[in-house]
A protein has these predicted regions:
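Extended non-transmembrane interhelical loops and adjacent amphipathic helices
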Residues: 1-16, 97-143, 221-264, 334-347, ...
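Membrane-integrated ABC transporters
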Residues: 1-44, 62-69, 88, 92, ...
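A hydrophobic transmembrane-helix motif
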Residues: 43-53, 149-183, 188-209, 262-310, ...
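Cytosolic ends of transmembrane helices, especially the final helix of ABC transmembrane type-1 domains
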Residues: 217, 244-245, 288, 307-346
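ABC-fold ATPase nucleotide-binding domain signature/coupling loops
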Residues: 382, 420, 426, 483-516, ...
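Helix-to-loop junction immediately C-terminal to a conserved catalytic motif
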Residues: 415
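ABC ATPase nucleotide-binding domain helical subdomain, centered on the C-loop/LSGGQ "ABC signature"
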Residues: 424-426, 441, 459-503, 547-548, ...
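C-terminal portion of ABC ATPase nucleotide-binding domains
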Residues: 492, 548, 556, 565, ...
Length: 616
């Protein structure tokens, strides 16, 4: 993924935007973060400070009563801080865990508002996969914003506490000192120490940022492949077991995930950072030890403070270097935030219409395709070309044609999942793009061939809502021929589909699931009913039953019916025949089958020949 160059202010705005989304997802996070940062910072400094006070008392007046009080304060204070730190940290950990679930829900909710073309767009799907994969592999994106912000807040508090506790280290002792001790007692020594600390921090930040960038880059490239490989384990687990594909799977895993290139990048990045950091820490410890020892020798600080400053200055150095590293990592993380924001803010141009769909008592609606042509986004190939057609409420229209002829695309345009590339679709003479999108969509009940049922109750699947009219659900199930089966289940319509959420859920056959999808289309009770291969998964007896009930199912609605089985289209008022994206014929079954040179006649005879041969 390309890491664009941004100014510090641009990065800061993006980070603050990420924190804002975090706050929306987990509103209780910030208060616990502040508390945890305070307790976490005080926890190591408090024992250091109390130890220094105890040592100073031991080498000073050695008052036993004061020593006892200091010891009690040290032990009790450390215990209380430890309890408070564990409490706040436990709360944060729980929020962290909750965040991942809510983060998924947040992305899912955003996707619910996408245009349909974005849901089908491979680039959008790849972006969604990258967001999930990188987050799972490295916590990059929104999770890392808050993790690093938490660290930065703690490091800032560490720096402030360190400065407050070590301020006396830079005082100048009275009296004359020559040579090295004279230099240590001068302001120049303080400047040199500050310069050494700054140089140490700068180099540490550079090492860490370079290492993190390499590691994140390698892991982000590996993450989609990693997710894909492990998804195969879930989806194809049965085949792997039956056909003994484990060795092939393991070989592919090693080939893709254990490439020398990635291993070398990760090892090199981690080793160089660890070695560099170890060397810098050693140099810093030597410098701090010499400086504080010299200050103690000339009497600027006491022996107890020598111990305090040794620990405090080192913590200051660590905090500053890690602070810079965190800031660098946070800025590097913005490349993942940018993709997350682009995904969350994907525009939806379907909601520009402002007209209300007329609520007619006579439900008299007419749909017209006027010279409609269409090609999918990122494609130059026309899928539909110059389609002209009208149909009114109450008509039963069949859409037929060979695979790839444009049937399903025609339905997607009718339902306004896509808008035409050229031409217009009119509802009662008005361009459908001028209507409010939700109201126009409310005109259609659809049962697609590639329908989806969810691991919820039958009632929830049929009603597509938590506000369920149970009698209506039962009625719809009866109309599609599944009422008796559902009534015989222990929990009736409240039986769960599958066992994802409930152990007593039921696994329905493909045909039964298709009937549930049909019942869902009926439950919506919209003026237009669209059925895409509604009997594809049914056995012949069940198929005949559905066709026998079709007049009841469609009743006074406009039904648009897609099928490869032309015999099932005979009951329709009109049949639209598509071929290579063109509407080539329109008429009744008797009319079209009589046109000897027509496409419908060709398709009808081809299927009739198949059944004749099978019978023979």
């Amino acid at each position: 993924m390309e890491n664009k160059k941004r100014t510090f202010m641009e990065d800061l705005k993006m980070i603050l935007k990420g924190i804002g989304i975090w706050q929306k997802i987990t509103p209780t996070y910030v208060p616990y973060l502040i508390l945890d940062s305070i307790f976490t910072c005080l926890k190591p400094y408090f024992p250091l400070y109390m130890s220094a006070e105890i040592v100073n008392e031991l080498v000073g007046t050695c008052d036993l009563q004061r020593l006892l009080i200091l010891a009690v304060i040290a032990v009790a204070g450390s215990f209380v801080l430890s309890l408070l730190s564990r409490f706040s940290h436990g709360k944060l950990e729980a929020i962290y865990e909750l965040f991942y679930t809510r983060h998924q829900a947040y992305l899912f909710n955003a996707a619910n508002h996408f245009q349909y073309e974005h849901l089908e767009d491979p680039e959008v799907a790849l972006s969604r996969t990258r967001i999930h994969s990188v987050m799972n592999a490295t916590s990059a994106g929104l999770p890392k914003v808050i993790f690093l912000t938490s660290d930065i807040l703690r490091k800032l508090m560490n720096v402030i506490l360190s400065v407050v506790l070590t301020i006396s280290l830079f005082q100048v002792a009275p009296g004359e000192h020559s040579g090295f001790f004279g230099f240590v007692n001068s302001p120049w020594a303080a400047l040199v120490l500050v310069a050494v600390v700054a140089a140490n921090s700068f180099i540490s930040v550079k090492l860490a940022t370079r290492s993190i960038s390499k590691i994140n880059g390698a892991l982000s490239e590996l993450a989609p492949t990693n997710n894909m490989i492990f998804s195969y384990m879930e989806a194809q687990g049965t085949d792997m077991h039956i056909f003994k594909l484990n060795s092939i799977f393991l070989s592919e895993f090693k080939k893709h995930m254990m490439r020398p290139k990635w291993v070398q990048v990760l090892e090199s990045a981690m080793t160089s950072q660890a070695t560099g950091k170890h060397f810098l820490n050693l140099v810093m410890k030597i410098v701090v030890f010499i400086f504080t020892a010299a200050k103690a020798w000339i009497g600027v600080i006491g022996i107890g403070n020598f111990i305090l400053y040794q620990g405090t200055v080192q913590k200051f150095v660590d905090a500053v270097s890690e602070l810079g590293s965190n800031i660098g990592e946070l800025r590097d993380n913005n490349q993942y935030l940018e993709e997350t924001f682009a995904y969350l803010e994907m525009p939806n141009n379907m909601y520009k219409g402002t007209l209300a769909v007329e609520k007619r008592d006579d439900i008299d609606y007419e749909i017209e395709f006027r010279d409609v042509s269409f090609k999918y986004p990122r494609s130059e190939e026309w899928v539909l070309r110059h389609v002209n057609m009208k149909f009114k409420i109450g008509d039963k229209l069949a859409i037929v044609g060979e695979n790839g002829s444009g049937k399903t695309t025609f339905i997607k345009l009718l339902c306004r999942l896509y808008d035409p590339t050229e031409g217009k679709i009119l509802l009662n003479g008005i361009d459908i793009t001028r209507y409010r999108y939700d109201e126009y969509m409310g005109l259609f009940s659809v049962a697609f061939q590639d329908y989806s049922l969810f691991a919820f109750s039958i009632a929830q699947n049929v009603a597509a809502s938590e506000n369920i009219d149970e009698d209506r659900v039962v009625s719809c199930l009866n109309r599609v021929g599944l009422g008796e089966k559902v009534a015989g289940l222990p929990n009736g319509v409240h039986t769960y589909i599958g066992r994802d959420y409930e152990n007593d859920g039921v696994d329905f056959s493909g045909g039964e699931q298709q009937k549930i999808a049909l019942a869902r289309a009926l439950y919506k009770d919209a003026p237009f009913m669209i059925l895409d291969e509604p009997t594809a998964a049914l056995d012949p007896i069940a198929e005949a039953e559905v066709y026998a009930r079709f007049n009841d199912i469609a009743s006074d609605k406009t039904s648009v019916f897609i099928s490869h089985r032309l015999s099932s289209c005979k009951f329709c008022d009109e049949i639209a025949v598509f071929h290579k994206g063109h509407l080539v014929q329109l008429g009744s079954h008797d009319k079209l089958v009589a046109e000897k040179n027509g496409k419908y006649h060709e398709l009808w005879n081809a299927q009739a020949q198949y059944y004749t041969d099978k019978t023979a």
